[in-house]
């Protein structure tokens, strides 16, 4: 495990990329702290409950790479934001408006990345006009901080390394590049572009689009990811 962590950390440093590994397989704050001590800027979680465990274990910066929906969970998100830097993915105007309303009531600001659908077809915004509209909405809200964008090419993660895999990732990166260009032209300049996984980071890193990579599974499953 230590060798895998060192190998991953060295790779991302060589590419001038921040490392924010996904901990859905890692699970424990103790291992997350080992990774952070080796150079990661924080972790990525799939669920609010995972983020709560990580914060309780002392992790100070967390991206929740899914939408937090419903007033009760948003209230928990607000509470967690008092204890650590929490960023969450968003892709829906109604949810963002609810987040802003509850954040105002709780006297906190919530950090968000807008998720762009770059081929996974599970979540994220597909149409450029919808993406720009959500950027504009967030810009007008007092308690939502726009930090950037997230795009996940997960449909390519399990493919064997081949021209087909590279073509799939290339198509995703082209979608991401176009979306970023359109947003920047309208004055929405991201600090963070998050994405990439253990099955794709070796290719994604060469496109120069991301500021941080979420690869975490390779901490354990080095044989699957050819470290």
Indicate where each model-derived feature is located.
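N-terminal, Lys/Arg-enriched amphipathic/low-complexity engagement segments
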Residues: 1-8, 15
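Short hydrophobic "helix-edge" motifs at membrane interfaces and signal-peptide entry regions
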Residues: 13-15, 206
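Glycine-rich phosphate-binding loop signature in dinucleotide/nucleotide-binding domains
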Residues: 15, 106-108, 187
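A generic secondary-structure signal marking the coil-to-beta-strand transition
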Residues: 19, 110, 209-211
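Short glycine-rich phosphate-binding loop at a beta-alpha junction
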Residues: 19-24, 192-194
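Active-site-proximal beta-alpha core segment in soluble small-molecule metabolic enzymes
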Residues: 22-159
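Active-site loop/helix belt of alpha/beta enzymes
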Residues: 118-227
